[in-house]
């Protein structure tokens, strides 16, 4: 685990302890189990594939540890509406406060503003956060292989599925992919950003892609910034993309999405 990831995970455990002290697990579980309005995250991606289109998981992100504030005028509902109007398949919403200036209400607001399924983008290490995710309306959660032992990943995946959520498992190398492929999820995300150096290489996806088979969906994450990047991935058989920063830096995020993915089609 990288130094920054170690730091973030330590923070998460502190946050969970504080959350448990103010709101017990049973209460959050009850909220999660009472939450209706489930949207099928995987089906939304496959629907785009069936039309021969890129399936874009469009990110709602204010800031990051490496870049600082990315979008000053940050209005999650308006951003989500823009994405939905311009062909996004799903949303990804940052809920981590300390490092990404995210918030649970951003996911709630973004999802309420459109018809798209939403991923809770956070560093999930405990069942409490899985219940939180469903309670706030998430349709999918992120599990980062670098941050979790396999038995824990399996347990968190099982709970997410029980609550009606999909799981996107994120990997960066062969060892992490070995673990990810032992989960049931169809969604395998390849993070092109090295969490130790923050360097980005699209070759990471291309290297791991041949092993993401058996009906699984490979999701390329980080570093997709140009039409050439998109064409490279599509020519290699990748048709699902998680993109945030390239859209967040533009005045109209949805129009930026359309230019990047659909202008050439």
UniProtKB/Swiss-Prot annotation:
Provide the GO biological process annotations.
L-tryptophan biosynthetic process
Q: Which UniProt keywords apply?
A: Amino-acid biosynthesis, Aromatic amino acid biosynthesis, Decarboxylase, Lyase, Tryptophan biosynthesis
Identify the pathway.
Answer: Amino-acid biosynthesis; L-tryptophan biosynthesis; L-tryptophan from chorismate: step 4/5
Looking at its record, which EC class is this enzyme?
Answer: lyase
| PROSITE patterns referenced in this protein's UniProt entry, alphabetically | IGPS
**What is this enzyme's catalytic activity, as reactions?**
1-(2-carboxyphenylamino)-1-deoxy-D-ribulose 5-phosphate + H(+) = (1S,2R)-1-C-(indol-3-yl)glycerol 3-phosphate + CO2 + H2O
* Coiled-coil residues: none
EC numbers: 4.1.1.48
Instruction: Please verify whether the record's keywords include Amino-acid biosynthesis.
Output: yes
Q: Where is the signal peptide?
A: none
Pfam families cross-referenced by the UniProt entry: IGPS (PF00218)
Q: Which domain of life is it from?
A: Bacteria
UniProt-listed InterPro entries: Aldolase_TIM (IPR013785), Indole-3-glycerol_P_synth (IPR045186), Indole-3-glycerol_P_synth_dom (IPR013798), Indole-3-GlycerolPSynthase_CS (IPR001468), RibuloseP-bd_barrel (IPR011060)
Tell me the disulfide pairings in this chain.
none
Could you tell me which CDD domains the record lists for this protein? Answer: IGPS
Q: Name one GO molecular function term.
A: phosphoribosylanthranilate isomerase activity
Family annotation (NCBIfam families): PRK00278.1-2 (NF001370), PRK00278.1-6 (NF001373), PRK00278.2-4 (NF001377)
Q: Which family does it belong to?
A: Belongs to the TrpC family.
Q: What is the name of the protein in this document?
A: Indole-3-glycerol phosphate synthase
Q: Which organism is it from?
A: Chromobacterium violaceum (strain ATCC 12472 / DSM 30191 / JCM 1249 / CCUG 213 / NBRC 12614 / NCIMB 9131 / NCTC 9757 / MK)
Report the gene name. Answer: trpC
């Amino acid at each position: 685990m990288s130094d920054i990831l170690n730091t973030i995970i330590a923070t998460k455990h502190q946050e969970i302890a504080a959350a448990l002290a103010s709101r017990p697990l049973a209460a959050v579980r009850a909220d999660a189990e009472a939450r209706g309005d489930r949207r099928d995250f995987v089906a939304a991606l496959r629907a785009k594939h069936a039309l021969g289109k890129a399936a874009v998981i469009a990110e709602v992100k204010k800031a990051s540890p490496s870049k600082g504030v990315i979008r000053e005028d940050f209005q999650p509902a308006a951003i989500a509406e823009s994405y939905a109007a311009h062909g996004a398949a799903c949303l990804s919403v940052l809920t981590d406060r300390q490092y990404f200036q995210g918030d649970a209400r951003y996911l709630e607001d973004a999802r309420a503003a459109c018809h798209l399924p939403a991923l809770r983008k956070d560093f999930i290490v405990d069942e409490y956060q899985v219940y939180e995710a469903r309670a706030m309306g998430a349709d999918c959660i992120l599990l980062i292989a670098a941050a979790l032992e396999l038995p824990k990943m399996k347990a968190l995946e099982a709970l997410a599925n029980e609550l009606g959520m999909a799981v996107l498992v994120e990997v960066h190398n062969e060892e992490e992919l070995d673990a990810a492929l032992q989960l049931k999820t169809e969604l395998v995300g390849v993070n092109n950003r090295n969490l130790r150096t923050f360097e980005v290489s699209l070759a990471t996806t291309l290297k791991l892609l041949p092993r993401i088979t058996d009906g699984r969906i490979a999701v390329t994450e980080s570093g997709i910034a140009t039409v050439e990047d998109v064409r490279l991935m599509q020519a290699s058989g990748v048709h699902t993309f998680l993109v945030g920063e390239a859209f967040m830096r533009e005045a109209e995020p949805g129009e930026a999405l359309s230019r990047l993915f659909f202008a050439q089609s």
